[in-house]
Amino acid sequence: MRRRRVLVLGGASAASGAAYWFSGRSSEELARDERDREAVDTERDDDGSEPSDEDGSADETEPENGESILADSKGMVVFTYDDSPIEDYTLAYEVHSEYDVPGCTAACPGYMKRRDDYLDPDQLREMQADGWGVMSHTYRHRSLGRIGLAGPAHAGDDRLSVEANRHGAIEGDPLVVFDDEGETAATVAGRGSDSSGQYVELEAPLSEDVDESGYVRHPESFIRDVLRKTDAQLEAWGLDVTGFVYPYGRYHGVAEEVVRDRYEAVANHRYGGGHNELEGLDPTAMRRRYVETDRATEDDVDAFMETAADEDVLAIVGAHTQYDTLTEQRVRYTIESALEHDLAIVTMEEALAELERR
């Protein structure tokens, strides 16, 4: 696609009354949980070993002579696609290329290395050389933020009742179970659900009681190691990493501090919105708007783009190309709506560079 510098099309009116937030889990998210449980993916190399290097490099896409990428555009919008499934290449990249506009892939390199339904490094290198951005999404889609307990945990228990069992996805992962009075360490043995709700199984019984007001999370040092490893692998493949997207939108607790300390931009620091006011903007505390068909109507998309054009904001949209609810038609419609509202479709790296010029 070799990047455009200015994107300007005729304006169009848009419907109003967008619903700017969607909560709850879609059927596709539930299906992905099932695929993750079934996947043969038992590697345990989060111990600091360096990933092997491979040749490859990403072309520079900065505008020449420092000119603005906005020109006559009314604003900026960043398209973010999560998880790095193969559909990022076969669907999103193909459609974006037709319009000569970029997107950003939030990549999970641990899945890219091992699973055929994910991008391979050559494909992602091709995309970045053609103007796409690459963001970190953890090595194997780990939930980083704390999750509340659904009941008290007692010394001797080998199972935690939790509001969501995200932390139980990868056997052997370390955990911290804590409340206002203290904390205790644990190790993941698995996860599941029954008539009482979701749970995380532990390799060994807990050594201390934890109140039902408590939480479970990964240790801070482990979170830092996972992020370092994620970026190291992507960079070893010749990719430039700009920014972060939280898996499952789980950002609460110590993870927030770790992520904001490491990355210069976070696309989903909080739920909802997607219009990030430029005045006083902290790029590590941004929000985005999902555009899958079960989360937004065409009127919602148009209203979102209209607001992005009318107000002084950086707009961010998010989507999952592996979901049935993100159709080719919806990708096209969202791109066309942005262009019809005279918005420049940019990568996160380009958006940050533009912010520095202001």
Where are these regions (language model features)?
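Catalytic grooves of carbohydrate-active enzymes
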Residues: 77, 83-87, 297-349
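Acidic (Asp/Glu)-rich catalytic clusters
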Residues: 93-100, 116-136, 259-260, 276-280, ...
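Active-site beta->alpha N-cap acidic-glycine motif
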Residues: 59-170, 174, 184-185, 226, ...
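Interface-prone segments of viral and bacterial extracellular assemblies
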Residues: 149-154, 166-169, 207-214, 220, ...
